[in-house]
Amino acid sequence: MKLTTSVGILGYGAYVPFYRVKGSEISRIWSGEDEPVREKSVPGLDEDSLTMACEAAREALEMANVKREEVGALLVGSESPPYAVKPSATVIAEALGLTPRVVAIDMEFACKAGTTAAILVAGLIAGGAIKHGLAVGTDNAQARPGDELDYTAGAGAAALLLSREVESAVALIEYAYSYVTDTPDFWRREGERFPRHTFRFTGAPAYFHHIVGAAKGLMEEAGFKPSDFDYVVFHQPNVRFPLRAAQMLGFKEEQVKLGLVCGEIGNTYAAASLIGLVRVLDHARPGQRILVVSFGSGAGSDAICLVTTENVGRKKSSLERLLSKKVYVDYAQYAKQKGLLKVA
């Protein structure tokens, strides 16, 4: 899908809690041998997907420096909202001063909800319905203690302030391509606390099939090849999968490394690929092309192609500071902060 009207990123932001638990600490408790990430982010006792989304969206708004009343949409993608019935988007919109005249909605498509939010906001702008819009991906990822996901399920948020005022944009969205199938690789039924997954089924039939399908689809439709991109950001459930996907598609490791942050913060689910994009935008130079490919279980992938403008680099997010600001906790404190310890 090529946007018929130019849509740009005026501002962007990210939030990562400063608590960390090391993979070796999780292995110590559960006698695991594999550590898919070095460490992962852990939310504070007063943090959840809603509060993290507020922080990321506030940073994007401040970078964009737009009037709050001109932001016409706020789409929040997450699979871990704090309320089963009550939208996060209205709370965030109120906290940011966007209410009452704003389209605000919660969205869910596992780990690709954030990129889908961005595509829909871009569509509203390109269609002339709104001037500016916010797309947010945020998650406090859940995992059963001792499960494979317990090693990687992190916490974080990222936000994009999209606009038709492209002369001030740091990057322009050129193309978007979505690829979905009914693939039951990961799910959580109503009333269940933790998600379930078919571990071996999450690789080839799910992650790689959809990532490759979306990336190839966009490149074929737009006439691009891997060498046309300076950076590529894949959804990152662990460190290995994005590197393998890059190899399968013909990308080089140096195109992937900058946006690969899961080794430091774990899998932040709906925020994962967007946090990777934030890091790339913080370091990119004008005229560089970026490919972002998300993945959400169930299953599907969004591929988004962007090109940076001369404005990139003039302002940067707080991501590098957040990545370096760490307080390590042991497994007991981690379990307490994640709400894994229940008192009868």
What are these regions (language model features)?
Residues 1-47, 147-205, 209, 213, ...:
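Condensing-enzyme catalytic core mediating Claisen C-C bond formation in acyl metabolism
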Residues 9-11, 60, 71-74, 92, ...:
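Buried hydrophobic positions in well-ordered alpha/beta secondary-structure cores of metabolic enzymes
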Residues 18-29, 51, 80-91:
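A structural motif shared across PLP-dependent enzymes of the aminotransferase-like
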Residues 50, 54, 80-81, 99-101, ...:
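Claisen-condensing/thiolase-fold acyl-transfer catalytic domains that form or cleave C-C bonds
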Residues 56-72, 212-230, 249, 284:
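Phosphate/pyrophosphate-binding loops at sites that engage ATP/ADP/AMP, CoA/4′-phosphopantetheine
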Residues 68-94, 99-102:
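Membrane helical hairpin/interfacial module
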Residues 77, 133-139, 162, 174, ...:
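Short beta-strand segments
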Residues 126-159:
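Flexible, glycine-rich active-site loops centered on histidine and acidic residues
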